[in-house]
């Protein structure tokens, strides 16, 4: 059903369809779960109360601009617990920068138009540095004495550092031959 959109997105952005579909599945169960909280009122509240008022104030005004443009009607603009909305869970400010009108109807609708959402996701990944042909990740075997405090996406190190700590690709390749760019900072996700 979405093959043409995904193939066109791959040609334009270099992001393989499987990755875009994986994001869609993780973020909203393929559009089935897109949020249950009214976006504008929730962002308005968060912009006045709490620890991240400045951040949510920017998101609040971005949501108002989305509604003003008519891309999405207010009755359909709901968000998840984390503040994102639509098929692939964009924050309003991210939507403003990266959403695309794939079908050419004049609206960037990530709530009711899966084609716009999938194309926007590919654009988001490309603009975020996606490199076509590069692996996004691979399974690594770690030594029994590996310190789990070193794991996590915030603890990025060159593959050579992980190799020095005993990491080896499960398929037997050394991390140096894993397809990662030399000096690329990577993270171990457990």
Residue positions per predicted region:
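Catalytic glycan-binding domains that act on GlcNAc-containing polysaccharides
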Residues: 1-180
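Short, intrinsically disordered, charge-balanced linker/junction segments flanking boundaries
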Residues: 184-190
């Amino acid at each position: 059903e979405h093959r043409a959109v995904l193939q066109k997105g791959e040609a334009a952005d270099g992001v393989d369809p499987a990755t875009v579909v994986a994001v869609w599945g993780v973020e909203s169960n393929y559009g089935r779960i897109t949020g249950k909280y009214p976006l504008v009122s929730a962002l308005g509240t968060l912009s006045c109360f709490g620890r991240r008022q400045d951040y949510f104030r920017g998101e609040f005004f971005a949501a108002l601009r989305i509604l003003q443009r008519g891309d999405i009607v207010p009755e359909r603009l709901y968000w998840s617990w984390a503040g994102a909305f639509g098929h692939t869970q964009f924050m309003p400010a991210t939507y403003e920068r990266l959403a695309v009108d794939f079908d050419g109807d004049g609206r960037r609708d990530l709530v009711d138009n899966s084609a716009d959402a999938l194309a926007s996701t590919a654009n988001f990944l490309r603009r975020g540095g996606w490199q076509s042909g590069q692996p996004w990740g691979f399974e690594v075997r770690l030594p029994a004495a590996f310190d789990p405090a070193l794991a996590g996406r915030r603890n990025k190190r060159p593959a050579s550092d992980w190799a020095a700590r005993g990491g080896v690709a499960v398929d037997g390749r050394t991390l140096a031959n894993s397809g990662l760019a030399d000096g690329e900072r990577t993270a171990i996700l457990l």
